[in-house]
Amino acid sequence: SMTVAELRKMWEPAAQGRITTWNQVNPKFPKEKLMLFGPGADSGTFDYFTEAINGKAKASRGDFTASEDDNTLVQGVESNKNALGYFGYAYYAAHKDKLTAVAIDNGKGPVSPSLENVTNGTYNPLSRPLFVYVRESSAKRPEVREFVQFMLTNGDLVGEVGYLPLPKSACALAWKHFQDGKLGTVFGGHPQVGITIEQLQALEGKL
């Protein structure tokens, strides 16, 4: 397992050219070369990870192997015993016979990525909800309404491509908001790091 502080020490801008071996992150780690892999700066995963770990979107060391192709990242981590990388859960799930997921300790003990831990909010701060926004004028079109209804009533389908489905209660609330024509977002244009699905539902209930 690793702590959030250790991830920050490894990935923060100040680590570039300075933190190059595992034991520099934690003396208990081996004195081996640190090999890092991650998405490029145009990736939403990059933005969220740097916001969650380093406190500012796009704030990251630059001396790591970056790629917009998650399969390239998977191959890089898989082929190097001293490598660590971050990418979407879907790519870990598709290759979990070759990769090891690192449990993250955010102060309450190590927690591994899983549907249960993401849903109950314990896998923080490295889990996030994904959103679909519909233009008000488009929401009046029958085919758009049918698509949104299908998406929200068949949420379990996302599991087939490695994503984690929302609880049915969250889907029901989103569908009610859509039917009622409620506009806007509870985030005010800024990312919310570490928010749980339960907290998100409470906020959206106030829209």
Which role fits each region the language model picked out?
Residues S1-L207:
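Flexible loop/hinge segments at secondary-structure junctions
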